[in-house]
Amino acid sequence: MTSPPEPAPAPDGGATEPTEPAAEAAPAPTAADPAPAAGPTPGRHDPIPAGVRAIAGTLRKAGHEAYLVGGCVRDLLRGVKPADWDLATDARPEQLLALFPGALYENRFGTVAIQVGDETYQVTTYRHDGAYSDHRRPDAVVFGDRLDDDLARRDFTVNAMALAIGEEVGVDLDAEPAVDSARALDRADVADPAAIHDPFGGRADLAAGILRAVGDPAIRFREDSLRMLRAVRFAATLGFAVEPRTLAAIEVDASLARSLSGERVLAELLTLLAAPVPSVGLRLAQETGLLAAIAPELARQQGVPQGKVPGEDLWDHTCRTVDAAPRPAPDEPPLLRLAALLHDVGKPATFADGHFVGHDAVGASLTEAWLTQLHAPRFLTADTTNLVRHHMFAYDASWTDAAVRRFIRRCGASAIQDLLDLRAADNVGSGLSPDVDGLESLRSRCREQLDARVALDLSGLAINGDDVMKALEIPAGPALGQLLDRLLEMVVVDPMLNDRSRLLTLARDLAAADGATTGPAGPSSNAGTEPT
């Protein structure tokens, strides 16, 4: 059971999480007032936004320090465009508010939101933290004057570097990301190596592709147990190896992850699933015990015989299937990979005599319960559950067009392509070709029916509930819904029936056959069930 909701962490800053998110700030008068920090020489590409340099210039002009910190420094050195730009300074929040009229400070962690143009940047005062009695957030935050103290509280060495913003940095962010960290560092072309403040050896670890906790890993993970999930996530997203002492500390304290809120677990899981090869992180989570802490139903897959790829169990199949599922587009949730992760979650509970009877229905129930526990968005819970529920369809080339339309109606027109992609990934995860049992033929036939714009749900009928209520003089209620469902089934079988007058005639006939009379009583409730 996860604990109550709490603010989700920033993705890659590396600081103690969670921080209370700063509110959107009103625009600060930065166009003329700030003294911009030093920029790149002519002809060099400057990856640092002008707004960041403007903020840094104002801070430096006022006698304060200004550094980029956390994940943005790591990504700059990798030759990757940072998603977020986080600054750290010795200026106190009240000093920041005085320097930047319109800035907002609505948390206790020293983070001030400063808006420059259309962008809002987070600027945080140097700090060191007190004890972490709940393994999630510091009991007290003390503002400091030393950058090293601020970096010492961060999670991993690659996230514990700082860049003096006034220095020149040239990075080609239009080029393809380097395959390995060493090449990325070469291409980053930091003009002055001294501009990178690196007290914990993060740059060397970045070059070697190593994920290492700052200081004692046991202390870091007991401060904030989310850092263990971040470790396996970074292993997948960055392709890094977790340093042995860091990995061992995760194995010792993996059970602490049970206390994490659902939102924090979900945020890390979704980011991991969007990685190039998610199984890297998933397998680490299983091996260290993290998976058992956050998703015991998935952890139970290990050791369950699968009988598909020799020598592999059900968990191996799940990992293969996740890797085979299409990677999501930027800013899109990894729906398909989440469904791939959960598609066989019902198998351990249904395993008997070498079979998994009804595992799709059981899996759908477990999926809905787990994603609800994680406080996933309703659409993501519903869409993932639907894919898990319907992933065991059995197509045959003898299906009529009406059978194809009925299949689309049952699964949902908007879900069909995802469902077929999930089946293709499931096939690959089983050591087979994606197009087993005529999957591409079914995809083509589904596309034909969708392109024909035939009615596949109630919104496609030529009449609606109001039309039926007026024509038959019946009230709204379950019987009306059943009647509309029966009309839709008839149209699915014969699209030519989708005509207003025909449907109203059919509605009267169906109501009469059920013994219904017009008036308040309406059609009887024994309107039948949808044909299979």
Segment roles from a protein language model:
Residues M1-T532:
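Catalytic cores of the polymerase beta-like nucleotidyltransferase superfamily
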